Amino acid sequence: LIVNTFGNLPTYFNISDIVFLGGSFVSKGGHNPIEPAINNCVIITGPHVYNWQNIYEDMLRNNACFVFNKISILEKKIKKLFEDNNEMNKMKENSKKLTQKNFFDSDRLIYIIKNLIEVAPC
């Protein structure tokens, strides 16, 4: 399924195991991986993710996404994931846990907001 719409993606993320985020095989900067991660998807992207560089670096360190330079490698990896449910489930779990920890942990968000308020000029 290829989707090129705005505003409908969460519906598709909920029914997908694997999500390829476009705008990343050309120098467009990639797309935000947070929504598919929190919806328990394996995230696959190309190398041009500079709009979300820090997030992707964290996800790569935690085995929560795949970044590919070549379409041929991408095809092989997708086939392997569908053949190995353990790897797919582990990646889905990693991406969801990482996203929950970094973006939806209320204690962490309060800490960040408090620090921003303390350093913000009046």
Give the predicted meaning of each segment:
Residues 1-122:
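Nucleotide-activated sugar donor-binding and catalytic core shared by glycosyltransferases
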